[in-house]
Each structure stands twice: as C-alpha cells, then as structure tokens.
Amino acid sequence: MVTVDEVRKAQRAEGPATILAIGTATPPNCVDQSTYPDYYFRITKSEHRTELKEKFQRMCDKSRIKKRYMYLTEEILKENPSMCEYMAPSLDARQDMVVVEIPKLGKEAATKAIKEWGQLKSKITHLVFCTTSGVDMPGADYQLTKLLGLRPSVKRLMMYQQGCFAGGTVLRLAKDLAENNKGARVLAVCSEITAVTFRGPSDTHLDSLVGQALFGDGAAAIIVGSDPLPDIERPLFELVSAAQTILPDSDGAIDGHLREVGLTFHLLKDVPGLISKNIEKSLNEAFKPLDITDWNSLFWIAHPGGPAILDQVEAKLGLKPEKLEATRNILSEYGNMSSACVLFILDEVRRKSVANGHKTTGEGLEWGVLFGFGPGLTVETVVLHSVAAST
C-alpha cells in the first residue's frame, strides 16, 4: 500500500522553480511624453484650464518618461467622449474594450515566451493571468486559453484588481505551483491597459492626474518550471524565495475603486517615504538566510512606480546609480505598466547581461532581488539566483 507521504513526495519537484522564458508586448500606438499634455488637454476638451495644464506639464516633465504605449487612440476616444470627462458614467464602454484587448495583448506576450521556451504549448500545465484592467466571467485566463489553443485541462488561476505589486505575486504563485507539482510548466501573464483609468482632469483630484502622467499599457509573460530539461530548456533565473507584506501605517496610501466612471486612482504624497522607510526590513528578512547585507552586491528589479520612489529607495539604501538603471530605463521607455513592469525589467536585465558580456544573467552577479509595490501598501519581495549567461 502506498502512503500519503509517498504520494506527496512523488508529486514534488526536486529543484527550485526556474524562469525558462520571458516575452513582452505593447499596443502599436506610441505616445510621446513631451507632447502628451497638449494632446491630453485637447482630447478631454480642457484646454481652457491653463493652470491645471501647467501642473500636468510639470508632472510629465518630472516623470522621466520619454514615451508610453496606449491602446486608446484619438479615434477611439472621439468615439467614446464619456471616457474623456472626469466623472461621466463610462464603465460599459471601458469594459467592452478591455475584456477583448487584455487577453489579446496577453496572447502576444505569451506567444513570444512560448517561442523562446521552444516546447509544445500542450506541455503547459498551469496558467496564471493577472490584470487590473477590467473584470469578466469567464475571465481573461479562459479567453487566453482559447486564443492560444492550450489544453482544456490546463489549470487556471485568474488574478483581478491587484495593482502594481502583482508582478511579484505572479512569480510567487508560479514558484509554488512549479515546485509542488513535478513536471509542471506554468505560463504566467500580466496584461494591463489604461482604458479603465483614463479620464479628464480635475482641480480637486490631482493624484488622478499623477496616474495620467505615469501609466502605460503593456503585457509580459513568463514560463516557470522546476528541474529544466538539459539541452532542451534554457534557465534564465531561479526563484529562491518569495514574500509578501503590508507596510505599517500605510492605509489608503494607494487605492483604486471600480465605479460607473471606471477605475479611479487615489494616491497619498508620502508613498515614496513609506516604501523607502520600510524597504530595508524586507531586504533583511529575505537575505538573512543567505547572509547577504550588501545591497550593492545584488542585481535589482524594482517596480518603478514613479521617479520619487526610485530616488528615495536609492538614497535610503545607498545604492549605486547603476543598480536601478534597468528599472529607470523601462520607466523611461514604457511608463508604469502596473503588474507587467517587473517582468519587462527582468527581460531587460537578462538581455543586457548577454549583450554586455556578463558571465551571469544577473549583470554578472549571483544574487538579485525583485520588488513589487502597490495598493495596501503591499510589497512583494522575490529573491532571484542568476544562471550562466548564454548567447
């Protein structure tokens, strides 16, 4: 007779969860940040609000973003004028867009990841799908399963309305699924479109304008599995540990509320301070088992949030400027894509590591950290182990 313990042992993988492929995608519509204030105030018929426009111009100038990608074009917004007002009922129009476009953009990123992985998509056993853009039943996980032609028996998990920390959550879940299910290959997808948050300006809700200055659209996909097949699968990073915590005294620091007017965004000014004040505690807890206390000895993947968060984290930890270079570059080239950002940064780090001739996928270093920050304030901390870089 086989015991339960024997069954459990047989179900578990031997090695750590490993990222085997990464794919990214954006909508084709590219928006230049330098001209965005003129466009935004024109399309929302708010050009007469000159003082508010000047404030928004300053926000965009300070954002350190060069360009963003957006599904919403001028044509789409002209066809849906309610989305251009500050508080007009518009959820139906927004939902009609995102329930179609979120899985489509996710498919683009997933297709690239599957191609890099090089295996049959029938070997994907689990699907984790994450979005803060729109809610539907059956969800985007179901739609993506159909779009990609995955097996009907693929085990799906749908994550809605988590926000900017969720790229870390996706990695944490994929790690647990891969390590506790021998032979599992997990496709994890983050797909975000700002059609749910776009709205006109308001004098009394300046934090909404911060969101209009920062957020962009993008999707990223990874494939995660333990015990990579030699000479068939190419490891990129190993997922060593993953933790989540709610920061003290941070209630209401970042909120989003789904209403008839879409998803409203609320932000307190002390968010950068709250994150920078607490980040070392998360680092100490994550790296104590490895006896690492030099944060400059790590490669860094941090959700960009906005430039103020990065500046304060850098100063608080005494990080060298190059540590957050990949993070700042993704913010500059794409804006804040919510949950997808950290996976874009992970992709950038491994690609530049190869291009620059580093010995490992982590900029030549062995250990790294991935941080996700978002509503709560919630922080996800993932410890990464690089592997030998291969061209």
From Swiss-Prot:
Domain of life according to the entry: Eukaryota
Pfam families (UniProt xref): Chal_sti_synt_C (PF02797), Chal_sti_synt_N (PF00195)
EC number: 2.3.1.74
Active site: 164
Keyword Transferase: yes
Record function comment: Polyketide synthase producing p-coumaryltriacetic acid lactone (CTAL) and slightly naringenin chalcone. Can use p-coumaryl-CoA as substrate.
Subunit organization: Homodimer.
PANTHER family listed in its UniProt record: CHALCONE SYNTHASE 1, HYDROXYMETHYLGLUTARYL-COA SYNTHASE
Protein name: Polyketide synthase 3
